[in-house]
């Protein structure tokens, strides 16, 4: 067996041999300091190159733009992923790449028994209402010393999408080599049930590679959006293609620097997406059954936050962040109901807008910008806006806050914070969780840190109270967790896992 096939030997050689060579070099007599210095540089360069070439080490960036060296991902990871899937699948044809002109093209499906039935509670991005709240059943708040019970854990493709779940299946979208792949997994076992793929590879040095938007489930269909704008409607039981559109090409829009990241929103028979095209093509609605265009609105460049449905000021409306403002749009035709300028230093809005009262909306951005609560008052066929408060006490970068009993909890540039939603007053701030994500369940915050730890924090305004913590994933973790049928689902660029979090 070649040395490159023995990772432990390679790592040991890379870590031990260069220092040994340096020691021997500097102990050698009769060699000038200049030659020893050149030799030392050569040894270090060879050692580092060895790690990059043979052990898969690569450079990536944290959410704070800090340089991180990682041994995860790359060719070695793809081989592990493919070997794992092959080992756990019944004999089946190879993945069939569905062509745009062939809406009936089948996806790869297993000839094995169907998964156990389950609910469709967490069928949307961030759960019901896109609020990040799990209320289906109580969660365990007294965790064992070693952490929650692990139900399953396995490799996964790249990207930053979360999970949705319905009828015993968990859905996500991944990068596998040069394909974007929508995958359905048995939520109880982690076994892959079907995949549907197309050619696409979005790459970005700072932000990483792969799809970002989370697929959503509605009435037996999965709606998935790739990082390069490919929108697909699939049968949720089989992965069979129903229809597809590239929302960038269809609306004359250019891709964002960090890729398409906003999850589709299905409402009133329409699929709402944000391609960011001009001439009324910034926010677009397609018919959920046929994929035909229903309406288009605005001329703004897109943001990274996902559209949200909420009732504010007595009117059911779409809350949308664009690159330069927060807006409310009429569901039926996309008509602008209100707007509020919201321009960040980097032109990036990635946190979800939240309806925090009958007539109030919370918005936030990172990059030193901050947060605000807007009050909407009916005026004519729309609303006028008034700022209740605005400050920099909560800067949600590419994670979103949750509201609990009058207080907002969120990551303020990587540090957990609690803010009074009425006044904007900072109640506490502490604990470094990196640019991770969080959910609210049973009066507690379930935080998935940037380093892959799962942390339980009591949602209380008095002080930061960390209850429990355990390591769930290895490597940089920006993906939002999901909770369905008592299981906590987590993933990052290289692995995915399920943990039993239900109290019963």
Question: Each predicted region: which residue ranges?
Answer:
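Extracytoplasmic beta-rich repeat domains
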Residues: 147, 151-164, 195-216, 244-266, ...
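Short loop/turn segments immediately following the C-termini of beta-strands
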Residues: 67, 74, 127-130, 175-177, ...
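Internal/C-terminal transmembrane anchor helices
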Residues: 35-58, 72-73
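Aromatic (tryptophan-biased) beta-strands that constitute blades/sheets of beta-rich domains
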Residues: 67-155, 181-183, 188-204, 240-253, ...
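Hydrophobic, aromatic-rich membrane-embedded alpha-helical segments
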Residues: 7-26
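Loop/turn-rich, solvent-exposed surfaces of beta-rich toroidal or solenoidal domains
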Residues: 369-371, 393-459
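Blade-level signature of beta-propeller repeat domains, shared across WD40, Kelch, NHL, RCC1
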Residues: 369-371, 452, 476-504
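Short coil/turn segments that connect the beta-strands within blades of beta-propeller domains
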Residues: 167-168, 219-220, 268-269, 315-316, ...
């Amino acid at each position: 067996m070649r040395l490159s096939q023995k990772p432990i030997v390679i790592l040991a050689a890379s870590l031990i041999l260069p220092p040994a060579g340096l020691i021997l070099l500097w102990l050698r007599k009769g060699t000038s300091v200049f030659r020893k210095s050149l030799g030392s540089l050569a040894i270090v360069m060879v050692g580092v190159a060895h790690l990059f070439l043979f052990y898969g080490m690569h450079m990536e960036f944290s959410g704070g733009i800090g340089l991180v060296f990682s041994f995860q991902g790359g060719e070695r990871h793809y081989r592990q992923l493919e070997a794992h899937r092959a080992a756990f699948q019944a004999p089946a044809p190879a993945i069939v790449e569905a062509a745009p002109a062939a809406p009936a093209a089948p996806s790869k499906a297993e000839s094995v028994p169907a998964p156990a039935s389950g609910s469709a509670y967490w069928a949307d991005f961030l759960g019901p209402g896109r609020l990040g709240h799990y209320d289906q059943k109580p969660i365990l708040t007294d965790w064992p010393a070693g952490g929650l019970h692990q139900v399953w854990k396995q490799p996964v493709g790249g990207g930053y999408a979360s999970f949705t779940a319905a009828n015993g299946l968990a859905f996500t979208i991944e990068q596998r080599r040069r394909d974007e792949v929508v995958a359905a997994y048995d939520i109880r076992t982690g076994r892959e049930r079907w995949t549907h793929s197309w050619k696409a590879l979005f790459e970005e040095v700072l932000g990483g590679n792969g799809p970002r938007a989370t697929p959503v489930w509605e009435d037996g269909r999965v709606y998935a959006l790739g990082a390069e704008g490919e929108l697909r409607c699939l049968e949720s039981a089989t992965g069979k293609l129903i229809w597809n559109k590239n929302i960038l090409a269809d609306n004359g829009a250019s891709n964002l620097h960090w890729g398409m990241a906003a999850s589709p929103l299905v409402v009133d028979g329409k699929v709402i997406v944000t391609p960011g095209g001009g001439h009324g093509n910034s926010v677009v609605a397609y018919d959920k059954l046929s994929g035909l265009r229903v309406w288009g609105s605005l001329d703004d460049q897109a943001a990274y936050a996902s559209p949200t449905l909420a009732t504010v000021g007595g009117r059911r409306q779409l809350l949308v962040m664009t690159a330069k403002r927060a807006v409310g749009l009429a569901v039926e035709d996309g008509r602008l109901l209100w707007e509020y300028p919201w321009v960040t230093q980097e032109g990036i809005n990635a946190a979800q807008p939240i309806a925090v009262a009958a007539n109030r909306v919370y918005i936030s951005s990172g990059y030193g910008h901050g947060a605000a609560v807007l009050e909407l008052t009916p005026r004519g066929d729309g609303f006028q806006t008034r700022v209740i408060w605005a400050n920099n006490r909560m800067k949600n970068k590419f994670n979103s806050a949750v509201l609990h009993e009058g207080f907002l909890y969120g990551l303020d540039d990587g540090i957990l914070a609690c803010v009074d939603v009425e006044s904007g007053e900072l109640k506490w701030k502490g604990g470094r969780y990196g640019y991770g994500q969080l959910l609210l369940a049973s009066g507690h915050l379930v935080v998935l840190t940037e380093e892959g730890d799962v942390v339980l924090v009591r949602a209380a305004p008095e002080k930061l109270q960390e209850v429990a913590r355990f390591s769930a994933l290895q490597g940089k973790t920006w993906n939002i967790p999901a909770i369905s049928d008592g299981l906590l689902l987590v993933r990052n660029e290289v692995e995915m896992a399920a943990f039993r979090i239900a109290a019963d």
